[in-house]
């Protein structure tokens, strides 16, 4: 057996022993030893192999799977720019705390500084975005390497998952030729792992920060983000605290859930009389400025739940950080909760009444219709930009829905691949809500070979022909209208149906509410539902909704 084959087989075997069950592979020559070892392991049922030809999409596919399962997923590529294309997904995994094991093949050292083809500097390619980096020694025809190879895989897995802060790790693996098996199975020593399929190195469960934050307010507010929404909702229900989520009503349940929280926090007269003494924040809020404003208020004590020591606090106003909320030291004020509930009902009614007068379709209206149509226990992947805001503002209460958002660095890239990855490991129907630019940015994520599985995923594309989010920001003010379309609106006129046809993905344009509802019925396989909206209406609609909510909510 040649050294590259031996090393690759051991690496794959130890990944399996470390509970890695999904691996995304990008084809190439230099990573051929790993490719063949992964194929054999998949054929034996030891792992599921997903093959993609676009490295950027492949890495985001792995992010989606790892985020949904909470377990490390490995992604493998050849040398050169292939490795560089993993970088956006590595950055997202870093900031979102997603366990990702990146394996990049490389030329051996004697070729890298000698003008060899397809060579870049892959050592520490991802900088500080990875929890751990190692360049493995080039495999050689000698004994004593099995323990080294297996030990390094255990180190990488532990850094990705086993310590306080989950995230990406990077192993750069130089391979010398020959890169394919030579027909011999002989080696200098046993290449077996520990008996019983155990890891080479058993590691302790490091857990999270060994501390609890201690709520001590009678008039407090729970702010839930990302994967902590359901747990935060349960805690709030148990202790009588109002709870607001960045996902609106998705994942929130119980009488203390405030589905209109994003609207209420933007009503100045309401917050003036309903400023909480403490905010118990779980996760990392990123969407709304009114949320950041509350967390920055020096009169509000912020207690943050975070499973690692890298806590988000742009305003530098966090008082405590811990792994969970302890029992509160004081009983909640029932009148405080009742006032939030009354305001929530008034805001929701104002939004419904205003939306009823709007011509179909709007992004906000589509978000609400989608949420109502989702089957029980569905997964909803929400794109950045307007969809993240539309879901929070118009989604409505659905405590049974699972939500995933790429809010680590909140980019629009890789969302199609992320959604496919998350749907691949979700046991149930899956949906995605994304904008047209997000869809176009990762349309190559639709490309799957005939041997690859396609999940049951409906991708809803809200097509406003450009950057609709900018109409809601400062750039969308009338004072900047002269250059808006060229540098912010960026209309494209792309034919999404023709694009989908090229990838052999079913596509439909929903032109009426009934067509939209029909298109959302659960169906097997991957499909795209497009709805075309007029982004020139965004700014005015949001202004009318803010005014309606402000008028309906008491101070």
What do these predicted regions represent?
Residues 22, 68-77, 83, 92-98, ...:
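Structural signature of the thiamine diphosphate
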């Amino acid at each position: 057996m040649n050294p590259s084959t031996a090393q690759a087989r051991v690496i794959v075997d130890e990944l399996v022993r470390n509970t890695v069950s999904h691996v995304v592979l990008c084809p190439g020559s230099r990573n051929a030893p790993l490719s063949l070892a992964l194929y054999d392991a998949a054929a034996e049922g030891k792992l599921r192999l997903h093959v993609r030809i676009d490295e950027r999409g492949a890495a985001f596919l792995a992010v989606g799977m790892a985020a949904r399962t909470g377990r490390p997923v490995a992604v493998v590529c050849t040398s050169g720019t292939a490795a560089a294309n993993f970088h956006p997904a590595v950055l997202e995994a870093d900031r979102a705390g997603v366990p990702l094991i990146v394996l990049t093949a490389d030329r051996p050292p004697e070729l890298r500084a000698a003008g060899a083809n397809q060579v870049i500097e892959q050592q520490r390619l991802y900088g500080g975005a990875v929890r751990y980096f190692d360049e493995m020694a080039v495999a050689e025809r000698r004994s004593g390497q099995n323990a080294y190879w297996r030990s390094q895989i255990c180190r990488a897995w532990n850094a990705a998952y086993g310590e306080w802060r989950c995230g990406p790790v990077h192993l750069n693996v130089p391979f010398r030729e020959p890169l394919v098996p030579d027909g011999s199975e002989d080696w200098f020593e046993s290449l077996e792992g520990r008996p019983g399929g155990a890891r080479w190195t058993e590691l302790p469960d490091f857990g999270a920060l060994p501390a609890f934050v201690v709520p001590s307010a009678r008039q407090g507010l729970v702010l839930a983000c990302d994967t902590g929404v359901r747990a935060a909702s349960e805690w709030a229900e148990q202790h009588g605290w109002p709870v607001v989520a960045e996902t609106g009503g998705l994942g929130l349940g119980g009488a203390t859930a405030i589905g209109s929280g994003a609207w209420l926090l933007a009503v100045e007269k309401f917050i003036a009389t309903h400023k909480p003494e403490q905010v118990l924040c779980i996760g990392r809020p990123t969407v709304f400025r009114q949320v950041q404003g509350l967390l920055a208020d020096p009169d509000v004590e912020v207690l943050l739940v975070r499973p690692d020591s890298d806590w988000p606090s742009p305003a530098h106003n966090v008082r405590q950080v811990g792994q969970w909320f302890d029992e509160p030291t004081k009983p909640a004020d029932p009148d405080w909760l009742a006032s939030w509930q009354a305001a929530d009902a008034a805001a929701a009614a104002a939004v419904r009444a205003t939306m009823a007068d709007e011509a179909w379709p709007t992004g906000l209206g589509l978000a609400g219709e989608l949420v109502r149509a989702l089957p029980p226990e569905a997964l909803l992947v929400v794109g950045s930009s307007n969809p993240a805001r539309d879901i929070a503002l118009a989604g409505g209460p659905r405590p049974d829905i699972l939500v995933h958002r790429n809010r680590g660095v909140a980019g629009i890239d890789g969302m199609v691949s992320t959604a496919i990855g998350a749907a691949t490991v979700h046991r149930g129907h899956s949906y995605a809500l994304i904008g047209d630019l997000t869809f176009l940015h990762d349309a190559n994520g639709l490309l799957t070979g005939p041997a690859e599985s396609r999940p049951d995923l409906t991708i809803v594309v809200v097509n406003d022909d450009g950057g609709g989010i900018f109409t809601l920001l400062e750039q969308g003010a009338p004072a900047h209208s002269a250059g808006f379309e060229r540098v912010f609106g960026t209309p494209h006129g792309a034919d999404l149906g023709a694009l989908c046809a090229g990838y052999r993905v079913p596509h439909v344009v929903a032109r009426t509410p009934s067509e939209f509802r029909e298109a959302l019925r659960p169906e097997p396989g991957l499909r795209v539902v497009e709805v075309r909206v007029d982004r020139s209406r965004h700014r005015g609609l949001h202004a009318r909704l803010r005014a309606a909510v402000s008028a309906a909510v008491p101070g």
